[in-house]
Each structure stands twice: as C-alpha cells, then as structure tokens.
Amino acid sequence: MRRTFKIFSFLGVGSFAIASLVYWVLQGNGSNGHVFGAWYRMFGYHYEHPYQYIAVVCFTYAATGTLGTGLWPHVAGWRRRGFITGILIFTVLAASIPGGVLWKIHDMEAGYFTKGAQFWNDLLWGAATGLETGWLLTLLSFPYNLICFIIGYRLTAHGFRISAAPAKN
C-alpha cells in the first residue's frame, strides 16, 4: 500500500508540477497566451482556469499509471515501451470525461446554469462531449502535448522502476 501511494504521489504531483511549469513557460514565451488547442468560437475556459484542467489530466494519469505499474511491474523491453505509450493514450481518453464535466461546470459559472434534472443532463452532456472532443483538443495543443508526452513517458518509466524494486522492510 505504501508503494502504491508513493507511485501515485510521484506520478500525480510530479506530473502536475512539471506540466504546470511547461504551461507557464510556453504561455509566457511567444504563444500569445494560447498553449491549449481550441475550437473556433469555443469558450476558452481552459485559458481562464488552466491549472484545473492540467490537474484533471495529471491525476487521471497518476491513477492509470499507478494501476498499470502496480499490475505489471516486471514488463520489460518493447512491451514496457508499448505499455507506457498505452497508459499515456488511455490517460488522454479517460481525462477527457472529467475534463468535459469541468468545462460544463465553468460554463454554468459563466451564467449558463440549468436547474433540476437538466443540471445532471448537462453534466452528462459535458462528459460525452469531452470524450468526443478532448483527444482532438489535446492533439491541437502542440507543442505542449509533445513535451508533456515525453515527460509522462519518463515519469511512467521511473514509476515502473519504483514498482519493480524489491520491497524494503
């Protein structure tokens, strides 16, 4: 259990700190403040609250990375590389769901609030829309996506090393 918590903390806090730093550097260096991809005429809530969206992805990554490194700690060679790539791709898809819900919550804060049963339908719509479009918005977020993919790969590889290390008493 301690090892699982250690890996989750390492992946979650490490990825959030590094992804936030990468965002901060890119946002301040010539990208006109546009680090993330967006649809034409899309409300830019991810520009108003970037660290919330980064946190959603990072802690989804921490959960999937911890699960993957814990279940198959001794995967090696090309299988490990493929497995790490799979964890990162799955993270994008899985994080798109809560990311869509968060976008819908920010939409409600902007004045588009619904009541009663429609509230839950709107959140479900946000989850479905996030799953449909989140991966594409991630692809449009170049070079942020590439830098974070490389960092995520290295962090996950280290998570595998932590998971495969002999237990200390």
Locate predicted features.
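Juxtamembrane/disordered regions of integral membrane proteins
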Residues: 1-169
